[in-house]
Curated annotation (Swiss-Prot):
Pfam families: HTH_6 (PF01418), SIS (PF01380). Residues 37-56 bind DNA. Residues 128-266 form the SIS domain. Pathway: Amino-sugar metabolism; N-acetylmuramate degradation [regulation]. This is HTH-type transcriptional regulator MurR. Keywords: Carbohydrate metabolism, DNA-binding, Repressor, Transcription, Transcription regulation. Homotetramer.
Length: 266
């Protein structure tokens, strides 16, 4: 489980004290071997229980487990950095050659895949596969790059016999959402989870009794709160928005895994 990634992606939902803890852990990750929760609490002016609760919020049993995991992640990250001439999160610049751009893009996509797979809840995926396999009708929603991912998934699902709608027009998406029934499934794809059109479709689907499955980031969002199930994706941020490309890579890895799981389930 990549806790540094979870911290970065969950920042939008942190309280003031939680943000202090997150900032400390990221800034001092190389020094955590010699830091106790008591020392950390004193330095930040917060209670030890706040630190323990923060660790548990991220999925650790307590601060000790979180601290050891972060130390391990830091060591692994250093080894990877030393093994390549490119920094993991280096941005593409106007001076880069095509070869350097290709290497940076490939590394960004590799990182998105590694982090998405590391954070994946496979038990939840199995449950989602069971729900989709019983659905009389499936709607897939998304905008921009997410819509392309959705269209690809819709073609795959139709090939194996599912009734699927994946419309590019947002008005048509809304209309289809309002016609869903109990037992139907809506798969909403949005990395931010805050696109108004996608959120409105999810609200309509829930109102109709359909099951909403969101393929989205770890950050708290309206779509995440509406969904019955979530499939988490992770993508870095860079200056030239290779993030949108790595986001699509992460989303495609999730939808491909979902598709193969459904094929096996048949």
């Amino acid at each position: 489980m990549l806790y540094l990634t979870k911290i970065r992606n969950a920042e939008s939902e942190f309280t003031g004290n939680e943000q202090k803890i997150a900032d400390f852990l990221r800034a001092r990750v190389s020094e955590l071997k010699s830091v106790s929760s008591r020392q950390m609490a004193k330095q930040l002016g917060i209670s030890q229980s706040s630190i323990v609760k923060f660790a548990q919020k991220l999925g650790a049993q307590g601060f000790t487990e979180l601290r050891m995991a972060l130390i391990g992640e830091y060591s692994a990250s250093r080894e990877k950095t030393n093994a390549t001439a490119l920094h993991l999160h280096s941005s593409i610049t106007s001076d880069d050659s095509l070869e350097v751009i290709a290497r940076k893009l490939n590394r960004e996509k590799e990182l998105a895949l590694e982090q998405t797979c590391a954070l994946f809840d496979y038990a939840r995926l199995q449950k989602i596969i069971e729900v989709i396999s019983k659905a009389p009708f499936i709607q897939i929603t998304g905008l921009g790059g997410s819509a392309l991912v959705g269209r690809d998934l819709s073609f795959k699902l139709m090939k194996i016999g599912y009734r699927v709608a994946c419309e590019a027009d947002t008005h048509v998406q809304a209309t289809v959402s309002q016609a869903l029934k109990k037992g139907d499934v809506q798969i909403a794809i949005s990395y931010s989870g805050s696109k108004k059109e996608i959120v409105l479709c999810a609200e309509a689907a829930r109102k109709q009794g359909a099951t909403v499955i969101a393929i989205t980031s770890l950050a708290d969002s309206p779509l995440r709160r509406l969904a019955h199930f979530t499939l988490d994706t992770v993508s870095g941020e860079t200056e030239w928005r290779s993030s949108s490309m790595s986001t699509r890579t992460a989303q495609n890895s999730v939808t491909d895994l979902l598709f193969v799981g459904l094929v096996q389930h048949q």
